[in-house]
């Protein structure tokens, strides 16, 4: 064999290998970026969330989305479909910033006619710079540029881990996956023994940072709201946005008090709600003053994360119009409940519930 023949053979084999790899990834498509999986169970886990969300947002059939952090991961779209109508999917980003959540909304609105957004608001998510993601997002899966998908085609994890997982489940299906994806509710221990060990309470009164007389959004919050919330609300007047504030345990609010930022956080929350309520296509629900939930540590695995039963209960409550905020007086009343419960905890110097 001559050098030219050897070179031609080598190049042909190389081209065949490259083409075969691209074809294999594109056809099997473990993250459903090009088409929804029908011949196997896609490897959708909390660890693949930002990859899986790209395919779900692009190629699943839906008209409603769940947006938010781990506080939203235990929602069951089948229940939401029954309560609100339509077809829900979850586009959650565990620990996401408001920019991360904005990216999910952007892809959903650019590919589907979205009639309803259920959005769980964590104030922490608005403390980041409005263009800052809290996770490294595979942006090449979120755009329409096919050429940069080379990072997907030749991804070592895709080739060595996720394609084999797909092949293992070849011929199988999981009709419940739309509910079970990202769901962690059954994986942890709940109750005082899980939440309280090692935690020390104090009767010491902590001076709170001055929040000002009138609730006003901080500059950081303003930028997040202006860039990551309002454009979608204003550009999609026929879409119903259902924002809710998750029911963190009372211990979480006590920690905020210990840090001296309780009043600041409550004022930021009130100012944010007042901005959102100015829009006709927005509903706001506040579950943070639900004493029957937040004082019962059997609902929690830590200071914030509650069971799937609470997600189910929130869905039922929203469908019934319960805990809906319609004005400033109601916000202040809810905040007063939190203040009072924290005061009880400080006075007791131990968990009194």
Predicted regions located by residue number:
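Hydrophobic membrane-insertion alpha-helices, especially the h-region
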Residues: 8-26
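Membrane/wall-proximal cationic-aromatic binding patches
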Residues: 28-90, 96-107
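Membrane-embedded segments
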Residues: 71-153
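Short loop/turn segments at strand-loop or loop-helix junctions that form parts
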Residues: 120-124, 198-204, 243-249, 287-290
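Loop/turn elements at helix/coil->beta-strand transitions in domains of secreted/extracellular proteins
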Residues: 61-63, 86-87, 113-116, 236-241, ...
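C-terminal regions of proteins
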Residues: 270-353
């Amino acid at each position: 064999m001559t050098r030219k023949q050897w070179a031609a053979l080598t190049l042909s084999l190389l081209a065949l290998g490259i083409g075969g790899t691209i074809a294999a990834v594109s056809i099997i498509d473990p993250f459903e970026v090009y088409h929804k999986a029908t011949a196997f169970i896609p490897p959708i886990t909390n660890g693949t969330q930002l990859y899986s969300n790209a395919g779900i947002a692009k190629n699943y059939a839906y008209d409603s989305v769940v947006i938010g952090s781990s506080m939203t991961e235990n929602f069951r779209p089948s229940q939401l479909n029954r309560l609100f109508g339509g077809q829900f999917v979850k586009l959650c980003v565990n620990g996401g910033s408001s920019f991360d959540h904005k990216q999910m909304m952007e892809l959903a609105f650019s590919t589907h006619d979205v009639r309803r957004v259920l959005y769980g608001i964590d104030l922490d998510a608005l403390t980041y710079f409005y263009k800052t993601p809290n996770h490294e997002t595979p942006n090449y899966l979120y755009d329409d540029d096919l050429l940069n998908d080379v990072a997907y085609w030749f991804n070592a994890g895709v080739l060595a881990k996720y394609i084999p997982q797909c092949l293992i489940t070849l011929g199988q299906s999981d009709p419940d996956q739309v509910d079970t994806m990202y769901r962690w509710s059954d994986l942890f221990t709940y109750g005082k023994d899980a939440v309280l060990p090692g935690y020390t309470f104090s009767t010491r009164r902590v001076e709170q940072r001055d929040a000002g007389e009138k609730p006003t959004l901080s500059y950081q919050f303003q930028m997040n709201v202006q860039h990551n919330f309002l454009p979608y609300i204003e550009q999609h007047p026929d879409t119903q946005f259902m924002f809710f504030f998750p029911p963190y345990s009372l211990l979480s609010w006590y920690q905020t008090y210990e840090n001296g930022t309780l009043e600041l956080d409550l004022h930021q929350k009130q100012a944010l709600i007042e901005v959102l309520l100015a829009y006709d296509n927005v509903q706001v629900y506040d579950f943070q003053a639900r004493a029957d939930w937040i004082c019962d540590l059997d609902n929690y695995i830590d200071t914030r994360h509650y069971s799937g039963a609470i997600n189910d209960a929130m869905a039922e409550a929203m469908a019934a119009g319960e805990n809906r905020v319609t004005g400033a007086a109601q916000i202040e009343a809810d905040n007063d409940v939190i203040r009072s419960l924290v005061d009880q905890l400080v006075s007791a110097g131990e968990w009194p519930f």
